[in-house]
C-alpha cells in the first residue's frame, strides 16, 4: 500500500480521487510503472522536452531521476491526501519555473511551463499508463478510458496545464499525440536513452 492509502484508511482523507476512482484502479497496478519508462522515452524524443532535461543535466547524470520524480508526483496526486497531492505539484511547478531557454540543436524555445510541452509530458504518461494496464490487467471500456481522462484533467490542472485547451476525451488526447508524433525525433544528445 502507498503510505497515503494507509493515511486514508486512518483519517478518511481520500485525496482528490478516492479508492473507487479510475485513477486508483489503473495507477495501483505495478505494471503501470512500465508506462512511466515508456513515457520517459517519448519525452526524450521531443526535442524541446529533451533540451529542458539537458539543462538540468538529468539525462547525463541520472536519466532515471526524472522518471522517479514523475512517478512520485503521479503517486502523490493519485493516492495522497489533498495536501500531499497539492504540495507535490507545487514543488514540481517551482522546479519548472527555472527550466527554459533556447535549444541549441533546433533553435526552438523550451519552457517547462509551456502548455504544449506540459501537455506532451502529461499525455505520454497518461496514455502509457492505460497502454500497460490494458496489456497486463484487462481491456478498458471507452467509458472507463474517458473517466480516467476526466480524472487526469485534475492532475493536469495541478501542474498548471491549461485545461481549457486540453483534449476533452481519451480518444481526442490519443489523436493529439499521434498528430504531434510527426514533430518528434531522436536527437544525438538523447540517443543513448532510446532502445
Predicted regions, residues:
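Single conserved hydrophobic/aromatic residue that forms the stacking wall/gate
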Residues: 184-195
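Basic/polar, acidic-poor N-terminal "presequence/leader" segments
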Residues: 26-64
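Flexible glycine-rich active-site/ligand-binding loops centered on an Asp-His dyad
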Residues: 149-155
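Extreme N-terminal leader/anchor segments
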Residues: 1-33
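Small-residue-rich helix-loop
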Residues: 170-179
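Inter-helical turn/loop segments and adjacent helix faces that build the functional surface
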Residues: 131-147, 159-163
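Alpha-helical support elements that line or immediately flank enzyme active sites
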Residues: 75-78
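A glycine-rich, hydrophobic loop/mini-helix early in the fold
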Residues: 60-66, 71, 82-128
Amino acid at each position: 500500500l502507498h503510505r497515503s492509502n494507509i493515511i486514508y484508511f486512518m483519517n478518511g482523507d481520500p485525496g482528490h480521487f478516492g479508492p473507487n476512482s479510475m485513477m486508483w484502479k489503473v495507477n495501483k497496478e505495478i505494471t503501470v510503472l512500465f508506462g512511466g519508462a515508456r513515457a520517459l522515452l517519448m519525452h526524450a524524443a521531443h526535442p524541446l522536452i529533451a533540451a529542458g532535461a539537458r539543462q538540468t543535466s538529468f539525462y547525463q547524470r541520472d536519466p532515471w531521476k526524472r522518471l522517479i520524480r514523475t512517478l512520485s508526483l503521479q503517486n502523490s496526486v493519485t493516492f495522497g491526501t489533498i495536501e500531499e497531492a497539492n504540495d507535490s505539484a507545487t514543488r514540481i511547478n517551482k522546479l519548472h519555473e527555472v527550466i527554459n531557454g533556447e535549444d541549441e540543436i533546433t533553435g526552438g524555445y523550451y519552457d517547462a511551463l509551456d502548455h504544449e510541452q506540459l501537455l506532451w509530458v502529461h499525455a505520454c504518461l497518461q496514455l502509457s499508463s492505460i497502454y500497460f494496464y490494458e496489456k497486463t490487467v484487462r481491456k478498458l471500456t471507452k467509458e472507463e478510458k474517458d473517466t480516467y481522462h476526466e480524472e487526469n484533467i485534475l492532475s493536469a490542472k495541478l501542474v498548471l496545464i491549461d485545461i481549457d485547451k486540453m483534449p476533452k476525451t481519451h480518444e481526442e488526447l490519443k489523436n493529439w499525440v499521434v498528430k504531434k508524433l510527426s514533430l518528434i525525433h531522436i536527437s544525438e544528445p538523447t540517443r543513448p536513452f532510446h532502445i
